[in-house]
Amino acid sequence: MDKKVINDKFTEIFGEQAEATFFSPGRINLIGEHTDYNGGHVFPCAISLGTYGAARKREDNKLRFYSANFEDLGIIETSLDDLKYDKKDNWVNYAKGMIYFLKETGHDVDKGMDIFIEGNIPNGSGLSSSASLEMLIGVIAQELFNLDIDRVDLVKLGMETENKFIGVNSGIMDQFAVGMGKQNQAILLDTNTLEYSYAPVDMGNNVIVIMNTNKRRELADSKYNERRSECETAVGELQAKLDIKTLGELDAQTFDEYAYLIEDENRLKRARHAVWENQRTMQAQAALEEGDLEKFGRLVNASHVSLEHDYEVTGIELDTLAHTAWKQEGVLGARMTGAGFGGCGIAIVDKDKVEAFKENVGKVYTEKIGYAPAFYIAEIADGTKVL
């Protein structure tokens, strides 16, 4: 989608020219799943699917929003005096939340805005359309009002919006990947300290294929918060003998030595996943750096097995995609990505085998699940930016 198309659509809706045009990516996580709220490492990257926006500042305090993805909702209007969550405002709540927290933290958003958005992240796919939107609104406000805010601080406001405004108890990974992404690089992020480094993603003759189950996931209504609470309870049990705040502080051996403190089998499985997945993530980044793509692929597979059996967040749709992908020629690794319970998986596939891969996996999935999956080639993109 180019800049002119976005600007023309803005003018058609609002009758004025936009001041600036923006793009905010979605994200995939290569490995390190359900570790972000457990103080572990994650290894995400921004992708070329995302959310486009155009905006102008107003002279009054009205906020007017229009999404080409929800045309039937028309222009949704609110104001700077009414930044409260309201179910009928639908997707605009994410925007209201970002503006609310910018103002709360002392940033001078003193006029209204007209904002047009159009995204090409499939809805409910688990590719972080909400973080994409949050960071888009943050960068729009930063640009229009010339706000002096560090990008990592903007990322934190995105997480606050998700946690405190929308009511989803998620970690910081999605907003960090979306806001801090770099073309052709993944981010190794320690969610405990927010220390991060970029790692070039050189897949050789392979591409990353995103596999969409086409089963929507509803994060707020899923078992996400339940998993988080199971892990927090496990930390409490381990604290009887260990001076830790999060599972991410433990290596696998220390965890195994003290696992007897966790009294419930399910909690033990959840905690084991968080600890071992954190180790796998660091090993995967090292393997990628060394060019050992086969080892990287095996770690990706191991991640899915752990998410399926220990964390139990996959479900028949994601398992069918991953298990079928593993059997295909030219596949180095495959796993679910994102929170799970539907959404997407990723597979690392030889470029020359992609068409056969899509056909074979699509056929098995459709026969078993009753409807077709969708496939996209992931291009690793820059974080949220002015176009």
UniProtKB/Swiss-Prot annotation:
GO terms for MF: ATP binding; galactokinase activity; magnesium ion binding
First-listed, main subcellular location of the protein, grouped into a coarse class: cytoplasm
Active-site residues per Swiss-Prot or TrEMBL entry: D174 (proton acceptor)
Catalytic activity line of the entry: alpha-D-galactose + ATP = alpha-D-galactose 1-phosphate + ADP + H(+)
GO cellular component entries: cytosol
PROSITE patterns to which the protein is assigned, alphabetical: GALACTOKINASE, GHMP_KINASES_ATP
Compartments reported by the entry: Cytoplasm
EC nos: 2.7.1.6
Positions of the record's site feature: Transition state stabilizer: R27
Positions of substrate binding: E33, H34, T35, D36, Y224
Keyword Oxidoreductase: no
Keyword field contains Repressor: no
Pfam families for the chain: GalKase_gal_bdg, GHMP_kinases_C, GHMP_kinases_N
Name the record gives this protein: Galactokinase
Source organism: Ligilactobacillus salivarius (strain UCC118)
Lineage of origin: Bacteria, Bacillati, Bacillota, Bacilli, Lactobacillales
